[in-house]
From Swiss-Prot:
Gene3D superfamilies referenced in this protein's UniProt entry, alphabetically: Alkaline Phosphatase, subunit A, BPG-independent phosphoglycerate mutase, domain B
UniProt GO MF annotations: manganese ion binding; phosphoglycerate mutase activity
Protein name per UniProt: 2,3-bisphosphoglycerate-independent phosphoglycerate mutase
Alphabetized UniProt keyword annotations: Glycolysis, Isomerase, Manganese, Metal-binding
Catalytic activity: (2R)-2-phosphoglycerate = (2R)-3-phosphoglycerate
Cofactor(s) the protein requires to work: Mn(2+)
Lineage: Bacteria, Pseudomonadati, Pseudomonadota, Gammaproteobacteria, Legionellales
Gene responsible for this protein: gpmI
SUPFAM superfamilies xrefs: 2,3-Bisphosphoglycerate-independent phosphoglycerate mutase, substrate-binding domain, Alkaline phosphatase-like
One GO cellular component, as annotated: cytosol
Subunit structure: Monomer.
Pathway as given in its UniProt record: Carbohydrate degradation; glycolysis; pyruvate from D-glyceraldehyde 3-phosphate: step 3/5
One BP term from GO: glycolytic process
Length: 519
């Protein structure tokens, strides 16, 4: 399709409704059940289409649900990007995993010093932050390397998986340890504590103290017993309190001087805080009573440039992402989101680029400090909208990218009523943003990174559905008269479509396609 050759509206606003999927099912669909006059009007009167946001369309295995990291990477990248989950699984299948230099070097250090190897990771089949088969592969590698003490500190999911589903993963890895005879699960803790990303350092501290001092609310003889104890306390997997697994006459297993740690989460954002607690020489977020001097600390993927650890699978470099391409042409752009999704509209949208590009400003709106977001389903959407409306009216930017976290973050709680309220808040915010845009002659593309809020209950497990979905997501254009092509697109088509509407050809690195024609 040819480049749009008329005067291009300004600003163009890309609105990402995080966790907003499309489903014809109306029961337990918080989006369909919500009162959404603005969205109803958009779908009735403006051009719209659907996009694939899961599986191969976003560089994941067939059937694998999408997630925010992958979604933003494809929205900003404009191309299919092989994801870490796929890369690592392929390395396991080919045998390359078992020859990985970073892993082998760390394991050899532990063997030479007769020290323990501690595996940290989300023990889950979810495939969003980790996958349990990859943890099993590392246990296998450590066994074949002759490591005598292999300890798994299992972080439990219940968010990208059903709320009470950890037992199967625990039993599988326990059977593997029994077969090898040289390892065990040493501790359990819910991801609520170990994988915080919102600087709630009191949660991270509980995980760190469990790992380094054995400080635990509960003690159990086996991991299964520890999990059942958590369930008896009314906790689901995500919220399992720090639990040490050991015999009554033994001391807890902790990470000690000379030991090796391998963090097996492949997604960076929720692994950073705990990693900083181990590695940051200038760490001040809480008082570390113990800081073990480790022989090695390996991260499965790169978590951040200022985290100095060996990396088993370094990132693929992306060039000419949406942000970089616009920056090189002198366009001014703004990224705005609340804390929970700030990394996604900056780091991930920019293809893993930490620093802003020239002409790129960033605005962080703090997320509310509540235990879970069903307690405040509006989160910080109204505050962000207030800022956004003001910025639109000032006419300082060519492109504004914003993310509304509510459908995803409230959807993850499994609270259908709260999620419905969250959708209604977003609907009100969209009305204000579109009104402001139309008053200055601006335009909007509205999309999502993956599904979530459209499925709030799982009939198969008879539990609340707290995970993402593999459903399609919308793409709505609010602007000039236009028509979308008939074929379903994918998230990597968003950037080429956006560039077309801004009157720009896409760069050759972008393999996604423009989905719209201006009339």
């Amino acid at each position: 399709m040819t480049q749009a050759d008329n005067q291009n509206p300004k600003p163009m606003v890309l609105i990402i409704l995080d966790g907003f999927g499309e489903s014809d099912e109306t029961t337990h669909n918080a989006i369909k059940e919500a009162n959404t006059p603005t969205l109803d009007k958009l779908f009735r009167h403006y051009p719209h289409t659907l996009l694939e946001a899961s599986g191969r369309a976003v560089g994941l295995p067939d059937g694998q649900m999408g997630n925010s990291e992958v979604g933003h990477l494809h929205i900003g990248g404009g191309r299919k990007v092989p994801q870490d989950l796929t890369r690592i699984d392929a390395a396991i299948a080919s045998g390359e995993f078992y020859e990985n230099p970073a892993l082998i070097e760390a394991l050899e250090k532990a063997k030479a010093l007769n020290k323990a190897v501690h595996i940290l990771g989300l023990l889950s089949p979810g495939g969003v932050h980790s996958r349990d088969n990859q943890i099993a592969a590392l246990v296998e590698l450590a066994h074949h390397c002759g490591i005598k003490k292999i300890y798994l500190h299992a972080i439990l999911d219940g968010r990208d998986t059903p709320p009470k589903s950890a037992l199967l993963s625990i039993e599988k890895i326990t059977d593997q340890f029994h077969a090898y005879g040289n390892g065990k699960i040493a501790s359990l803790i819910g991801r609520y504590y170990a994988m915080d990303r919102d600087k709630r350092w009191d949660r991270t501290e509980k995980a760190y103290d469990l790992l380094t001092q054995g400080t635990a609310q509960f003690h159990a003889l086996t991991a299964k017993e520890g999990l059942m104890l958590a369930y008896e306390q009314g906790n689901t997997d995500e919220f399992v309190s720090p639990t040490s697994i050991h015999r009554h006459n033994e001391t807890p297993i902790t990470i000690e001087d000379g030991d090796v740690v391998v963090f097996m989460n492949f997604r960076a954002d929720r692994a950073r805080q705990l990693t900083y607690a181990f590695l940051d020489d200038h760490f001040t977020a809480f008082n570390r009573q113990v800081r073990p001097k480790l022989s090695a600390f390996v991260t499965l993927t790169a978590y951040a440039k200022d985290i100095h650890a060996a990396v088993a699978f370094p990132p693929l470099e992306l060039h000419n992402t949406l942000g970089e391409y616009l920056s090189a042409r002198g366009y001014r752009q703004l990224r705005i989101a609340e804390t929970e999704k700030y990394a996604h509209v900056t780091y991930f949208l920019n293809g893993g680029q930490e620093a802003p590009f020239n002409g790129e400003d960033r605005l962080l709106i703090p997320s509310p400090k509540v235990a879970t977001y069903d307690l405040q389903p509006e989160m910080s959407a109204v505050e962000m909208t207030n800022k956004l409306v003001e910025i639109i009216q000032n006419d300082d930017y060519d492109l504004i990218v914003c993310n509304f976290a509510n459908p995803d973050m409230v959807g993850h709680t499994g609270d259908e009523t709260a999620t419905r309220e969250a959708i209604q808040v977003i609907d009100d915010c969209l009305k204000r943003i579109i009104t402001a845009l139309q008053s200055v002659g601006g335009e909007a593309l509205i999309t999502a990174d993956h599904g979530n809020a459209e499925k709030m209950f799982d009939e198969k497990t008879n539990q609340p559905h707290t995970a993402h979905t593999s459903n399609l997501v919308p793409l709505i254009y609010v602007g000039r008269e236009a028509q979308f092509c008939k074929e379903v697109g994918a998230l990597d088509d968003v950037a080429p479509t956006l560039l077309y509407l801004m009157g720009l050809e896409k760069p050759r690195e972008m393999t996604g396609r423009n989905l719209i024609t201006l009339k």
